Curated annotation (Swiss-Prot):
This is UDP-N-acetylenolpyruvoylglucosamine reductase. The gene is murB. HAMAP family: MurB. InterPro entries: FAD-bd_PCMH, FAD-bd_PCMH-like_sf, FAD-bd_PCMH_sub1, FAD-bd_PCMH_sub2, MurB, MurB_C, MurB_C_sf, Oxid_FAD_bind_N. Disulfide bonds: none annotated.
Amino acid sequence: MKVSHHLYDQLSRITSEENVMVDELIRNHTYTKLGGKADVYITPESYSEVQDIIKLANKEDVPFTMLGNGSNLIVKDGGIRGIVMNLQKLASIWREEDKIIAQSGARIIDASRTALAESLAGLEFACGIPGSVGGALYMNAGAYGGEIKDVLESTIVVTKEGDIRTLTAVELDLDYRTSNIPDKGYIVLEATFALKKANSSDIKEVMDDLTYKRESKQPLEYPSCGSVFKRPPGYFAGKLIQDSELQGTQIGGAEVSKKHAGFIVNKNNASATEYINLIRHVQKTVSEKFGVQLEREVRIIGEDPVE
């Protein structure tokens, strides 16, 4: 899609011109370092700007995609048509009573660290999750026995019509690595986490232990999308992949990690196509060997490259 001067001018009036980028490479904004170009990449600085961008996209019938920190996401090599919005400039975190409130663009790691600084327990599990707060709600992110569902009290969202609503955690239908946010078309603006007062040294001890486990077991030296597959009932995805002798398997620059079989790393300037093909190869091999269908935890969006 060629971006018209009219659309560019309209978006530049909503936010500053420096926040509107045409033909922006999405790989520069994802943890996997994969993905083609966004027709328009925009980073609003207020909730009202978010509303106005959505309303403009609806009025002009322009496709619209929300992008978080890109930590659990693969964007195809053909990129994304229309408007891609990132809330990285809405990243404030603060305390109110025994609650931590964080804007969507803040990293969930930083929300966890703020809770530690305020001697509030409950977000320790998130100390190693690299995604944004909005992305964490989108997929009910979790690790080491904890998940967003355990601590989320409420959230402020923008609807696909551009209206602001406050929702309780129950209204998001949070479940294992899922929510109703994508189906409803909500855009998360901020989240309120209900925590408990605790001794900061005890909180730090838990976080240090989880950080050690993460750093010792995960291939953090290479770009990746984190855990690729959901945990199948009765199994562990990483163990199935390991027992299928897939560790070290490569397609192009993508490789099944030798350190943690549940990770696929971008070891040598992989394309999104190579990365996705390796995911499919792993799924096919595990299915044939064990009869287990591995379901992706990572989202894949965008268009295939033009041949």
